[in-house]
């Protein structure tokens, strides 16, 4: 009887652990989608929520629980990716404009402002010079 009571209690209400796991799975799907679509200038909370199969409001709540926001995370990942591209040392460095587009920025000016705000230096300061 005790075993049946225990099973009944478990099935009656989802545990906090299950809720946490399902929330973590949603955030994982959302982050994976963001990483796969960084270059998409139309990437926004609605697109990410649709890809994660949740509402925008629910997705925003899950990201806030991680002390972030959906779009804040998108910008952070875009800027980190841009920094990595700028600092590659293969001698075939792309232009700042090209890197801005690859990372989902509409203009090089917008990218430069965001980059400077994040890293306190211009993108061209980080960029490895091209080989001639």
List each model region and its residues.
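N-terminal positioning helix adjacent to the helix-turn-helix/winged-helix DNA-binding module
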Residues: 15, 19-30, 75-78
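Short amphipathic alpha-helical elements of helix-turn-helix/winged-helix folds
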Residues: 10, 33-37, 85
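An amphipathic alpha-helical interaction segment
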Residues: 1-18
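DNA-binding recognition helix and immediately preceding turn/loop
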Residues: 26-71, 91-106
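Sequence-specific DNA-binding recognition helix
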Residues: 89-129
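Alpha-helical DNA-contacting segments of helix-turn-helix folds
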Residues: 63-81, 85-86, 114-132
């Amino acid at each position: 009887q005790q075993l049946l009571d225990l099973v009944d209690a478990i099935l009656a209400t989802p545990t906090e652990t299950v809720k946490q796991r399902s929330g973590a799975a949603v955030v994982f799907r959302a982050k994976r989608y963001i990483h796969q679509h960084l270059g998409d200038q139309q990437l926004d909370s609605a697109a990410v929520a649709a890809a994660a199969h949740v509402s925008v409001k629910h997705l925003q709540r899950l990201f806030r629980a991680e002390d972030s926001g959906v779009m804040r995370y998108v910008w952070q990942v875009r800027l980190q990716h841009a920094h990595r591209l700028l600092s590659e040392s293969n001698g075939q460095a792309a232009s700042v404009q090209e890197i801005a587009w690859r990372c989902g920025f509409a203009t090089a000016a917008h990218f430069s402002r965001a980059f400077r705000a994040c890293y306190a230096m211009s993108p061209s300061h980080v960029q490895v010079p091209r080989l001639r």
